[in-house]
Amino acid sequence: MLGKARELANYQDEPEQLPTGSFGKNAFLRLGFERRPERTVLATLHRRAPLIVQQALYWDEGMPTLPCVSIISNAGGILQGDRYAIEIDLEPDTQAHVTTQSATRIQEMDANFATQTQTITLGANSYLEYIPHPIIPHKHSRFVQQTEVTIHPTATLIYSEVLMAGRKYYGTGELFHYDLFSSKFHAAHTDGTSLFTEKFIVEPARGNVSRLGAMGSFHVFCNLILLTPKTHADRLFETIDPVFDMDEGIAWGASRLPNDAGLLFKVMGMESAPVRAAIRKIWEAARQEVTGASLPENFLWA
């Protein structure tokens, strides 16, 4: 059970406000994509506030048959005692793009913690771009996320997770003032074969996050996971060069995942804009390699 993770042992007290996981604090979202003759459609949609999805839109000029789904929250952020769950299921030969409306803010906490579980299933020859906006942990927030992926060997997942250092420009600045951020990602093939598990825990009060070998002078961290067949991964690994540019405030590189699962990219930046640009470059290269399609022009407000 996610709430019993060892790193949460010191945060088991109940909030004085609404009880943990009560109505309005137990968000749920299920998205199911199916293939129709002309395009992929969002065939299944179950939602429980604060998580909301209205409908799929087809605004991607590079892939006009790609359903694009934006996850909305009407809560103004994730609060102490919140328990969120997201399920995304792609049937064989489907394609989808899922993102969030804006950054996810983990609000300041004085009791308990917040969790989010993500369960993603990809059928044969399916393709999913899951690229949410950044996570911004506020002062004394505690957040644990667990992502479970079941993927067919012929499918592709582009998964991005961006963690900000906090509210950098709030007051005198909140850099690494949160209590806990924990994220676990596990992937397995549809036959049950485990591919890899990655987990990172950040507890700024227990160690200097800005030390050399951790964040250093950077304030934005992105974990971008590309699960794709080996032929795609091999070509991308040879064509995407690492970058270290302190003048632009950006550094990133790639490594191979175990069991020929794909590639793992780590991106670090001083601000979110160069990190977003790096994500877009990797995303565009992966899409071109796997689907043959290009990305549309970036939105002016992106």
UniProtKB/Swiss-Prot annotation:
Coiled coil residues, start to end: none
GO cellular component, one term: cytoplasm
Keywords carried by this UniProt record: Chaperone, Cytoplasm, Nickel insertion
InterPro entries named in the record: UreD (IPR002669)
UniProt keyword annotation of Chaperone present: yes
One MF term in the entry's GO annotations: nickel cation binding
Summary of the function given for this chain in its UniProt record: Required for maturation of urease via the functional incorporation of the urease nickel metallocenter.
Family as reported in the entry's similarity comment: Belongs to the UreD family.
Chief localization: cytoplasm
Protein name: Urease accessory protein UreD 2
Subunit structure: UreD, UreF and UreG form a complex that acts as a GTP-hydrolysis-dependent molecular chaperone, activating the urease apoprotein by helping to assemble the nickel containing metallocenter of UreC. The UreE protein probably delivers the nickel.
Gene name of this polypeptide: ureD2
Pfam families: UreD
Keyword Cytoplasm tagged: yes
Localisation: Cytoplasm
Species, as recorded: Brucella ovis (strain ATCC 25840 / 63/290 / NCTC 10512)
